[in-house]
Amino acid sequence: MTIIPKHPSPTLFKPLALGKCQLQHRIVMSPTTRYRADEAAVPLPFVKEYYAQRASDPGALLITEATNICPNSVGEAHIPGIWSKTQCEAWREVVSQVHAKECYIFCQIYATGRSADPELLASRGFEQVSSSAVAAEPGCQPPRALDEEEIQKYISDYAQAARNAIEVGFDGVEIHGANGYLIDQFTQASCNQRTDEWGGDIPNRARFALQVTMAVINAIGPDRVGMKLSPWSQYSGMGIMGDLVPQFEYLILQLRQLGIAYLHLANSRWLDQMTTHPDPNHLTFVKVWGRSLPVILAGGYDATSAPEVIEMVYADYDNVAIGFGRYFTSTPDLPFRMKNGIALQKYDRSSFYTCLTKTGYLDYPYSPEYLCRSS
């Protein structure tokens, strides 16, 4: 269904200070994996055009697809990395294109842990690892639990990836602590069965996420760091523990005290039929985060629901931004359309993950109205 904005949202188009960035509106391009990197995890040459297309409205924030921090963090083929010189140079071109359009861009950095394809890892000489030897799904082979030295190495790899991102010009990094990847595997008791300082209770399960965050802060500064969490997501065996709410309340409170640039809360919808969550607009955790630092909300918002959430649910908050993922893929001029009441374009989900091709990636047009304005 094509979604047409009812009317421009005044709050959605208010400026927002986010770390070192002065956003001119509160529409954010959320991270979306699209498998457009080569076998060496280097973004393909046309990736820079994709991000440049979506840097269509000056002062916007774009967040890249999930980007691997080191070779052993890679969970799937054709996902980009940011550890090698060649990868970094490709990202430098992306950043340059986005900055030329007067927009901001953060690099989302992550490690997959037990969500990685074990055959891919084995072909590259690595093992599937996690916080504990707990399989993501029944019948799957359990990963190996990381030891202390390996945990510390991952923490330092996150910090180095952040340094690499800033060196090539990114405005900051978003630490991916969501969707059942490695940080989430430490945070949630459904996976983390450790009895040492990295597990066993709420503070210990939050320790890895916080140690990674502090290492990244020490590397690049708190005002260049965001964190993405998805407390309600049940992807990859997550979101089913009894103390989920107090676990994430504790983690979010600690992140707030670290003074990072923003918190990103996502209700991930990886299946077409997944449309509801216990707390679809994240109120439980936004109340903990508070009103002083920016929070990005994502999870299936469209041209109707985004203004409603920011104008009604969060009428008393002046720190909320809305993330769009799939609609930003299909609608490169999304902010312009939202502001001018122009329908967002339908997306073709079947082409989102077609590896290495421009189809479903670069072939969504701008609106005629946007092209007239630009000319």
Curated annotation (Swiss-Prot):
Functional summary from the UniProt entry: Chanoclavine-I aldehyde reductase; part of the gene cluster that mediates the biosynthesis of isofumigaclavines, fungal ergot alkaloids. The tryptophan dimethylallyltransferase ifgA catalyzes the first step of ergot alkaloid biosynthesis by condensing dimethylallyl diphosphate (DMAP) and tryptophan to form 4-dimethylallyl-L-tryptophan. The second step is catalyzed by the methyltransferase ifgB that methylates 4-dimethylallyl-L-tryptophan in the presence of S-adenosyl-L-methionine, resulting in the formation of N-methyl-dimethylallyl-L-tryptophan.
Binding site for FMN: P31, T32, T33, A66, Q108, H176, K228, G300, G325, R326
Top-level EC class: oxidoreductase
Catalysed reactions, as listed in the record: dihydrochanoclavine-I aldehyde + NADP(+) = chanoclavine-I aldehyde + NADPH + H(+)
Swiss-Prot/TrEMBL keywords: Alkaloid metabolism, Flavoprotein, FMN, NADP, Oxidoreductase
Family statement: Belongs to the NADH:flavin oxidoreductase/NADH oxidase family.
Protein name: Chanoclavine-I aldehyde reductase ifgG
Listed GO MF terms: FMN binding; NADPH dehydrogenase activity
Cofactor requirements of the protein: FMN
Any one biological process term the GO annotation gives: indole alkaloid biosynthetic process
Pathway as given in its UniProt record: Alkaloid biosynthesis; ergot alkaloid biosynthesis
Chain positions recorded as substrate binding sites: H176, N179, Y353
